Amino acid sequence: MTVVTPVAVAQPNGSDILVGSGQPLLLIGGPCSLESEQLGREVAETVSKICKKLGISYVFKASFDKANRTSISSYRGPGLKKGLASLARIREDLQVPVISDIHDISQVGPAAEVLDIIQIPAFLCRQTDLLVAAAKSGKPVNVKKGQFVSPWDMENAIGKLRDAGSDKVMLVERGACFGYNNLVVDMRSLPVMRSFNCPVIYDATHSVQLPGGAGGSSSGQREFIEPLSKAAIAAGIDGLFMEIHPDPDKALCDGPNSIALDQVEELLTKLVKVRAAVEE
């Protein structure tokens, strides 16, 4: 298995999380969109405790703006200013690192003041100016592989970031288009992208999404979260990305492919066992 140089992610307490070969599994998890600060706190606090118990590193994720929703009427989030303020309070009060996605260059500066990791959405993974601006922020950059991009083509995205001065790059596999309104996961992409000396994270929830499959919104098949996550762990990933909600059926964004908060501990416990078996 390829040895990947760990990426350091700052924590509120001043220490670093290390993501890569020989390091604890990373979980990036939280609601798709920051529906409310209270909901975000509930998820962050609960998942943080679970991860500490299981020896998993944790970064809380929630979007302040979902700029790529299927319909104009879809809920997008609290917006840049309010959303970042909520994320800053969650970070400080719960002492958990935070990540969110940016959609244009103007958001990089404000986001970098709050976020511990800047995320590039899948649809924007080839946007050179956005990647360069994110790299120059000095923060670790988590790039989601577009559903339309091959794993080997992501070496170009890494090249843009590294050329702009960043050596803190992580990649996320979130499935590939399989005809219309469907995604599949090619597990070969995980070792391919790790071969670029870059930690690779598997998006366990977006990978089971059915994009636009519900007409005015996306649908999903959350029953496949567990088996595909086990396969990704066995393939040697460095981390997992999960959208987590207390009541996915009532979520304002990506509910059909989110995992329920009360199911997280059971799933992570199984995945830790799979990782331990693979590492023996």
Swiss-Prot record:
SUPFAM superfamilies in UniProt: Aldolase
Pathway of action: Carbohydrate biosynthesis; 3-deoxy-D-manno-octulosonate biosynthesis; 3-deoxy-D-manno-octulosonate from D-ribulose 5-phosphate: step 2/3; Bacterial outer membrane biogenesis; lipopolysaccharide biosynthesis
Record bears the keyword Magnesium: no
GO CC terms in record: cytoplasm
Any single GO BP term: keto-3-deoxy-D-manno-octulosonic acid biosynthetic process
Keyword Transferase: yes
Keyword entries, A-Z: Cytoplasm, Lipopolysaccharide biosynthesis, Transferase
Disulfide bond residue pairs: none
Family of the protein in this entry: Belongs to the KdsA family.
HAMAP family documented for this protein: KDO8P_synth
Protein name: 2-dehydro-3-deoxyphosphooctonate aldolase
The organism of origin for this protein: Desulfotalea psychrophila (strain LSv54 / DSM 12343)
Lineage summary: Bacteria, Pseudomonadati, Thermodesulfobacteriota, Desulfobulbia, Desulfobulbales
